[in-house]
Amino acid sequence: MDKYIENIKEDLPHSILIIGERGSGKHKLYNKLCELKNFNYTMDITDRITKEFLNSEEIQNPVNIIMLSVDLSKLTVRQQNMLLKLFEEPSKYLYLCLFADSEADVLETIKTRSYNIVIDKYARDALEYLITSNNKNIILEVCNTPGQIEIANHTDMEALYKMCENMVKKMRVANYQNALTISNKINFSDEYDKYDLFLFIKMLSYKLMTEFYETQSKELLYAYLELKELNKRIWLVNNKKQQFERFISRYWKAFR
């Protein structure tokens, strides 16, 4: 992580954008950045992006040196535009650290006004070294970062693989009500005995595209596009289970 901050550790930019896949170490890098300056306090404001908050005295005229962090991948375009308020006449006491899973998640106006750090992709052999479960081949097909590997190590990947395989190969004959029960197997909020939502999306995406390359089936392509849309929308809403069930409904219809 040190290589990413070598050029800025003597003069910390007021806005830093860190881009990297989930589990790539964005927050570890953020913690290192926070050690570079004597901040009075740090605050995650991802869930507080409103005009009222951004115009508040606390933000516009801070009396302490503060670091605000924001996950742009969880913000709508409208919220990102609101965030630009902080770039107009920034206080010398205010610092921003912005996270994004990909460049596509970030408005160009934010990107150009920030110091950009893009975390390199991890080599396959480096990831393989981190795997402690017996499902090495399956994990390496869907996990690209140490954080994803960590979750996979504590997941029954064989069972997840089988569930996603059934969603691809047997959805044509599946009963609608049975299809909806898939949502009961996904962790939407601290239900760690269930499948991680992001890992599920990665696995189903892998299975859909593998099958599509073999069959060129249009229904598989439609189902994959529905999954991509889910991955864009679900991180922006509070009621993730409801959003997921809407996806299952559209996914089921794609095979009809």
Enumerate the predicted regions with their spans.
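Structural motif
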Residues: 19-22, 44-47, 68-72, 99-101
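A generic short-segment signal for beta-strand/edge and adjacent turn/coil regions
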Residues: 84-88, 216-217
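Conserved alpha-helical scaffold flanking the Walker A/P-loop in AAA+ ATPase domains
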Residues: 6-7, 46-66, 71-74, 78-86
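Charged, glycine-rich active-site and insertion segments that engage polyanionic ligands
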Residues: 1-39, 92-94, 100-256
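AAA+/P-loop NTPase substrate/partner-engagement loops
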Residues: 39-53, 104-106
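Loop/turn-to-beta-strand initiation segments
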Residues: 61-66, 91-97
